[in-house]
Amino acid sequence: PADNTAVTLYVPDAELWSMDEPNLYTVIARLQRCNESYDDLYVNVGVRSYTVTPDGGFSINGVPTPLRGVSRHQDRLYKGNALSIDDHYEDAQIIKEVGANTIRLAHYQHSQDFYNACDSIGFAVWAEIPFISVFKPGEDAHAHCRREMTELIIQNYNHPSIMFWGISNEILIGGISQELVERHHDLQKLCKELDPTRSTTIAHVSHTPTDGPMHHITDLESYNHYFGWYGGKIEDNGPWLDKF
């Protein structure tokens, strides 16, 4: 009968994974009977730790490291979402070449090929579910969100590049309600039950009040501002951050 087995592995003098030195190890799970192999599963993993604090910012393996990044959609001209492995790795290489060390994957689960590229090339990744813009009340909709979050975490928790689980994006575009706030608290709880080792985060739309009930739900928060794009000037970013 099917069963679960937990094994603790000791890796002496491990070569740590980081964005600058993305060292990977291959874990092999092999199904055997009477010394005969029936199946193999190969998984690349990295050994690393990270912290995020208000005063110290982001540190990986104890080294303070500023995060500079971009957001990425899984999309190309004439291909749409159907990207090849080469496309995924080319995207990652281009992002690396501009000097970024962080990628936010908007706003849905991306291909395993791109997560693998982030593992091997070296990025801190924010992965999120497609819970965006407008909240749909009711048990069925929330059950779907929980299922999406569960799949995202369970399918990707071995990727050392993933540091942050995003629970929603600009959800207050459609307004706020008590149910919306409660559903976010439940998603936060679910994330911590499935993976207590990683940070959770949320992306607020620009007009979200800085003192409302949507704050302090996740470990980290961000604001999507479009100064110099939809309105204002690029120079407005600094004063807003100072005020925030």
What do these predicted ranges mean?
Residues 117-121, 140-145, 215-217:
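Short low-complexity, flexible loop/linker segments enriched in glycine and/or proline
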Residues 1-112, 116-125, 148-151, 163-164, ...:
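Secreted/periplasmic carbohydrate-active enzymes, especially glycoside hydrolases
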Residues 148-178, 206-208:
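Active-site groove signature of glycoside hydrolases
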Residues 122-130, 219-225:
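Short hydrophobic/aromatic-enriched beta-strand-loop microsegments
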Residues 182-244:
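Extracellular glycoside hydrolase catalytic/binding regions
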Residues 103-111, 135-137, 142-143, 208-210, ...:
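Acidic-and-aromatic substrate-binding clefts and catalytic sites of carbohydrate-active enzymes
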Residues 135-142, 168-195:
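Active-site cleft segment of glycoside hydrolase catalytic domains centered on the general acid/base Glu
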Residues 72, 108-110, 130-132, 168-170, ...:
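Active-site beta-loop-alpha junctions enriched in small/polar residues
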